[in-house]
Regions:
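Nucleotidyltransferase catalytic core that binds NTPs
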Residues: 1-151
C-alpha cells in the first residue's frame, strides 16, 4: 500500500484546497492530511487564520479524500510523521517548490501545481475590501472585477 502525506492550514477552504487533496489522494492508496494547529500557525507568524482548527479539520474530512487526519503542532513533525506512518510520498502545493526537498531523504517529494486564481489570502483580501467599502453593490462588484486586472 502506497501512503501519501500532505500538510496545510486549509483556512477558508476553497476549490484549490479540494483540488490539491484530490490530486494527493490520486498519488497513492492511503492519504494522511496534516492540518496545522492554531498554536503552530501563530508560531510561524500566521496570525490571520480565520477558521478554527475544528472547522478546518471538518472541511478536510468533508472532501472524503483523507483516510486519516493528524494535527501538525511543531517544527520537525513532518519527519516524525513520515517515519511513524511509513509514508512513501510527501506532497504539497507548487508554491513550496524546493522548500521540502530535504524530505527526499525519507520519502519521495512531489510538488503539485496550484489551482490558479484562488487562495485563502485572496479570499481574505476580498472579504476585507467588502467590509471596507460602503455604497452601491453594483459599484462594489465592478470594483472587485477591476481588481483582477491590477497587480
Amino acid at each position: 500500500m502506497k501512503k501519501v502525506i500532505t500538510y496545510g492550514t486549509y483556512d477558508l477552504f476553497h476549490q484549490g484546497h479540494y483540488n490539491l487533496l484530490k490530486r494527493a489522494k490520486e498519488l497513492g492508496d492511503y492519504l494522511i492530511v496534516g492540518v496545522t494547529s492554531d498554536y503552530f500557525d501563530k508560531s510561524r507568524g500566521k496570525f490571520n487564520v480565520r477558521d478554527s482548527l475544528m472547522t478546518r479539520i471538518e472541511n478536510v474530512k468533508a472532501t472524503g479524500f483523507a483516510d486519516e487526519i493528524v494535527v501538525e503542532e511543531y517544527f520537525g513533525q513532518k519527519i516524525d510523521d513520515i517515519k511513524k506512518y511509513g509514508v512513501d510520498i510527501f506532497t504539497v502545493g507548487s508554491d513550496w517548490k524546493g522548500y521540502f526537498d530535504y524530505l527526499n531523504e525519507y520519502c519521495h517529494v512531489v510538488y503539485l501545481e496550484r489551482t490558479k486564481g484562488i487562495s485563502s489570502t485572496q479570499i481574505r483580501n476580498i472579504n476585507n475590501l467588502r467590509l471596507g467599502i460602503v455604497g452601491n453593490e453594483s459599484v462594489l462588484d465592478r470594483f472587485l472585477d477591476e481588481l483582477k486586472f491590477v497587480s
